[in-house]
């Protein structure tokens, strides 16, 4: 009888272990697992002690290249207090974690980026009185917005909300514009298709003025709305001044 009870106990323990293992397995499948993407050590709160900045990403399987979400953790080098920040819009592959001074206060902001299809997603945040606050958010990722229209003689006319204008010469792709039926060989617009602009395809931090304060250099593509024919690149520079402000813009072939 004792032997029977012992065997029964082993069976019950085995069933419990299997149940727990399956529960854990199913939980991982449905919610994903969290992985450390990158870790940096630097002073982000001006106490002359190195703080630990960690970027975590959640994905379903270790071999997946696409992350479903990201979480930023900053651990105070003195108190070991942890502060967390999860930008809800951030997802994608090839994530990066960088530290740059965008505001000019000699302390770095935290910049995370990831590729999401043909666009780049970026979140920039800073530690402000023990709270991680975003300074570059979801709406900033749309890039420069302007009204675009085809003009005569293979050109694009662009207008910004503040009234400024942008003129784009498309002579370099005249054969494509005529073969797509957008222009006649003589340069007359045939009222077919319209130009549009993509979100950022690239957004990098760069100390353009070599003064230790970083700006954002963004690249967008002007394309035809219906046929997605690339027309030119739009390069923009954004400097922080109570928010990132457009300071320069030009187009390139």
Task: Report residues per predicted region.
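N-terminal post-signal-peptidase region of extra-cytosolic proteins
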Residues: 94-97, 110, 221
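Short, solvent-exposed coil/turn segments
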Residues: 67, 92, 231-233
């Amino acid at each position: 009888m004792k032997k029977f009870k012992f065997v029964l106990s082993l069976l019950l323990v085995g069933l419990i272990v299997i149940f727990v293992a399956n529960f854990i397995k199913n939980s991982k499948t449905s919610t994903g697992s969290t992985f450390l993407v990158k870790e940096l050590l630097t002073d982000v709160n001006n106490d002359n002690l190195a703080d630990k900045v960690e970027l975590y990403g959640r994905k379903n399987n270790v071999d997946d290249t696409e992350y479903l979400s990201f979480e930023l953790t900053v651990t105070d080098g003195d108190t070991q207090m942890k502060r967390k920040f999860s930008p809800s819009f951030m997802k994608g592959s090839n994530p990066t974690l960088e530290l740059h001074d965008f505001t000019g206060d000699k302390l770095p902001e935290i910049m995370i980026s990831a590729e999401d299809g043909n666009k780049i997603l970026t979140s920039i945040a800073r530690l402000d009185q023990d709270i991680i606050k975003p300074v570059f958010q979801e709406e900033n990722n749309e890039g420069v917005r302007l009204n675009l229209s085809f003009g005569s003689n293979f050109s694009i006319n662009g207008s910004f909300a503040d009234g400024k204008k942008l003129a784009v010469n498309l002579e370099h792709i005249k054969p494509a514009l005529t073969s797509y039926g957008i222009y006649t060989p003589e340069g007359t617009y045939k009222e077919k298709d319209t130009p549009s602009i993509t979100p950022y395809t690239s957004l990098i931090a760069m100390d353009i003025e070599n003064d230790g304060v970083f700006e954002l250099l963004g690249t967008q593509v002007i394309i035809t709305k219906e046929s997605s024919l690339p027309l030119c690149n739009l390069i923009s520079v954004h400097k922080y001044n109570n928010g990132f402000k457009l300071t320069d813009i030009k187009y390139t072939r």
